């Protein structure tokens, strides 16, 4: 092709090539600086659209991880409070065992020790709040903890783990911020009997004193006959004493049964408020201590159930947290596979383009000089 004084086609071709090199060089530099080969929709519409949706899912999943971590701490705090409650109840059980056949002063010391442990339980449950929620003082209602995020078509779902229920109902939060423990699973510890305990003790003490008097009279009559077997008066007195004990048997049995009903209604709180326990007839002490010990054992049982329930929740939340973290890692890896630049390849490409640019500029200069020689 001949030369034209109007158009230098070789120079135009070289210039276009140089422009393409510069354009590719800019793209390569941009990929290296950002680390992305798909930075906008113009790079690859399909990949950009998919990766953008995945980035949205990743950001949402990160928020879910934060929510699960918050819920995890709420459950862990509740588990700690339940464990402390169990330890305090164990101490109370030991105190109740040691209360038998003790003086009134010793029993008062035991009552004070039990009061301290009851306060520890109350403090533990009261302090089990985290993030504005207290799983243990929710009146038996379940607390929802974020567990996952999923997209199904155009619908989006946030899955929840429910923690709580009747087994973890230690009380109800009142308007003043205190927890009413009498409405929870430890109502046998913190509640109050619906019976007239003082009247029951008075009635039973009178019956016990009468029975003891009859038994003492029988023992005295038996001793008199043993000392003088031929004493007819002593024999008559013995028969009368036996009859008196027998005649009172039904009343005494009923008195014990009635008092056991009263004692079984007693809470641990009732027991620690009682005065003069050590001065009661031994049979009355025994009935009271047996009933209260049964109440404490029940409290231990329901606390163990609560511990098992909250322990399962801890494991469930931990497992879900690990799963969501792995899922988040997979999403991040998927995004990277779509849009991340191959830095080794881009570096090599950049070097090649820089060489092409360096060679292209002198070539364009030579073509311009050749065209100038025509004139």
UniProtKB/Swiss-Prot annotation:
Database matches in Gene3D superfamilies: f41 fragment of flagellin, N-terminal domain
Glycoprotein found in the keyword field: no
Location of this chain's protein in the cell: Secreted; Bacterial flagellum
UniProt-listed InterPro entries: Flagellin, Flagellin_C, Flagellin_N
GO molecular function: structural molecule activity
UniProt keyword terms in alphabetical order: Bacterial flagellum, Secreted
Gene Ontology terms: cellular component: bacterial-type flagellum; extracellular region
Primary localization class, coarse: secreted
Functional note: Flagellin is the subunit protein which polymerizes to form the filaments of bacterial flagella. Flagella are an important component in the invasiveness of B.bacilliformis.
Family affiliation: Belongs to the bacterial flagellin family.
Protein's UniProt name: Flagellin
Organism (species): Bartonella bacilliformis
């Amino acid at each position: 092709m001949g030369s034209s004084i109007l158009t230098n086609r070789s120079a135009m071709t070289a210039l276009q090539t140089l422009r393409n090199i510069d354009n590719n060089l800019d793209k390569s530099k941009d990929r290296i600086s950002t680390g992305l080969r798909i930075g906008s929709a113009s790079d690859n519409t399909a990949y950009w659209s998919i990766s953008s949706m995945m980035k949205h899912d990743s950001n949402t999943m990160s928020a879910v991880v934060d929510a699960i971590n918050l819920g995890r701490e709420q459950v862990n705090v509740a588990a700690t409070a339940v464990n402390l409650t169990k330890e305090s109840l164990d101490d109370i059980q030991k105190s109740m065992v040691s209360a038998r056949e003790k003086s009134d002063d010793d029993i008062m010391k035991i009552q004070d020790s039990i009061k301290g442990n009851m306060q520890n339980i109350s403090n533990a449950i009261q302090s089990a709040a985290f993030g504005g929620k207290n799983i243990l003082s929710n009146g038996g209602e379940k607390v929802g903890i974020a567990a996952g995020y999923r997209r199904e078509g155009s619908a989006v779902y946030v899955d929840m783990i429910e923690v709580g229920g009747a087994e973890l109902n230690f009380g109800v939060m009142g308007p003043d911020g205190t927890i009413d423990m009498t409405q929870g699973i430890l109502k046998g510890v913190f509640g109050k009997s619906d019976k007239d305990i003082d009247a029951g003790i008075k009635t039973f003490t009178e019956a016990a004193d009468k029975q003891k008097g009859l038994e003492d009279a029988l023992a005295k009559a038996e001793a008199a006959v043993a000392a003088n077997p031929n004493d007819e008066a002593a024999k008559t007195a013995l028969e009368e004493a036996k009859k008196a004990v027998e005649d009172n048997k039904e009343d005494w049995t009923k008195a014990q049964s009635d008092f056991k009903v009263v004692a079984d209604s007693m809470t641990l709180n009732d027991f620690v408020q009682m005065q003069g326990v050590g001065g009661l007839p031994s049979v009355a002490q025994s009935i009271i201590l047996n009933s209260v010990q049964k109440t404490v054992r029940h409290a231990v049982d329901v606390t163990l159930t609560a511990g098992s329930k909250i322990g399962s929740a801890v494991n469930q939340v931990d497992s879900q947290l690990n799963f969501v973290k792995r899922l988040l890692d997979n999403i991040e890896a998927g995004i990277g596979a779509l849009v991340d630049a191959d830095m080794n390849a881009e570096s090599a490409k950049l070097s090649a383009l820089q060489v092409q640019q360096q060679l292209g500029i002198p070539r364009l200069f030579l073509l311009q000089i050749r065209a100038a020689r025509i004139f």
